[in-house]
Amino acid sequence: MAPPASTASSADPSKPTAQKLTEESDEKTLRKYFSTKVDDAQQKVADKSQNVRRLQAQRNELNTKVRMLKEELQQLHEQGSYVGEVSKAMDKKKVLVKVHPEGKYVVDVDKSIDINSLNTGARVALRADSYALHKLLPNKVDPLVSLMMVEKVPDSTYEMVGGLDKQIKEIKEVIELPVKHPELFDALGIAQPKGVLLFGPPGTGKTLLARAVAHHTECTFIRVSGSELVQKFIGEGARMVRELFVMAREHAPSIIFMDEIDSIGSSRVEGSSGGDSEVQRTMLELLNQLDGFEATKNIKVIMATNRIDILDPALLRPGRIDRKIEFPAPDEKARADILKIHSRKMNLMRGINMAKIAEQIPGASGAEVKSVCTEAGMFALRERRIHVTQEDFEMAVGKVMQKDSEKNMSIKKLWK
């Protein structure tokens, strides 16, 4: 009888290989499963870390608010302070302060305040119990007054002002020269001019020249209209004038331009009504600020009006207004210069005679000459052209100067 076959020899040789593949497949599945779990756990950790950082930021913000509220609560628990005005410094640790309406006191200065920063007229806070000076306060300025300060300097230059060479020279001497070179006046031993009055018919370039001065002097420019200083309640206009000069002193050197000054600077007459009395109070405060007890060395005032005949003589006297500059209607040469300035950027046809156009507008102001250029461009636009001709200027002259110029126009041009 034959012996039984061996088990190793009778088994299928492919079975160990299949088992090995199964084990590898299971290992890959487990590796992929745990890798996914690890990625999910890392994502959760990242989210939690982000939440922790967000909560820490919120905690810091809340701690800041709590600290500010504690400081505010502590200030509310403290006694109130008196507001005073520094008269003068007595020594390194004491100053003379005027408290309204009680009087003047010599007070101690807190260690945290520099004695050199306490200038005459500065607003300060005094402790209610010891009258010690513990805080330097900013000057009180009405928001309406602070808005009068021109933040952006106008882009007008002297080259944009035509036919006013004499006026430009005079205003440079009075306004620009003292601001840029005050040492020249000190060397000569003469007082600097304080103010200048620009007067003349409407549209002759008074405001334009003031804008050019603001551009070239490179100092603080404050623009105010006279009608803005006429207020409803008693004393409001005078207070605004006072705060206007306070703000000008803070930002010195500065220039104050008062347009339409005749609205508050008219001559005083007897038997005026209540409204006129308030206007007169405003003018009296202006007179005091121009030539009062306090010096205004670094403040220059430019006033403009077209009614110099109704201004008060007290406003026009030397010491307040040191120079009066007249702006007459431009002559023929000045009108030609103004036409060249305003037509500089226009697309003109060749051969346009500006001198001939200037001859056709006798007595025109600078504003009317500028209007001629604008109307000439409108006539060209009406005919769908991108260039301006001599005929456009002649028709613009007829329209601006209100002449009967229909005979010079064709029916086609009138109704096209």
From Swiss-Prot:
Task: Please state where this protein is localized.
Answer: Cytoplasm; Nucleus
Record flagged with keyword Membrane: no
Q: Which InterPro entries match?
A: 26S_Proteasome_ATPase, AAA+_ATPase, AAA_lid_3, ATPase_AAA_core, ATPase_AAA_CS, NA-bd_OB-fold, P-loop_NTPase, Prot_ATP_ID_OB_2nd
Q: Which family does it belong to?
A: Belongs to the AAA ATPase family.
Please spell out the taxonomic lineage of the organism that makes this protein: Eukaryota, Metazoa, Ecdysozoa, Nematoda, Chromadorea
Q: State the gene name recorded for this protein.
A: rpt-6
Q: What happens when the gene is disrupted?
A: RNAi-mediated knockdown at the L4 stage of larval development inhibits activity of the proteasome. RNAi-mediated knockdown at the L4 larval stage also results in increased mortality and transcription of immune genes containing the elt-2 binding motif when exposed to Gram-negative bacteria such as P.aeruginosa. RNAi-mediated knockdown at this stage, furthermore, prevents the recovery of P.aeruginosa infected animals treated with the antibiotic streptomycin.
Q: This chain belongs to which protein, by name?
A: 26S proteasome regulatory subunit 8
GO BP terms, alphabetized: proteasome-mediated ubiquitin-dependent protein catabolic process
Q: Where are the transmembrane segments?
A: none
Subunit structure as annotated in this protein's UniProt entry: Component of the 19S proteasome regulatory particle complex. The 26S proteasome consists of a 20S core particle (CP) and two 19S regulatory subunits (RP). Interacts with elt-2.
Keyword Cell division in record: no
For ATP, which residues are the binding ones? 200-207
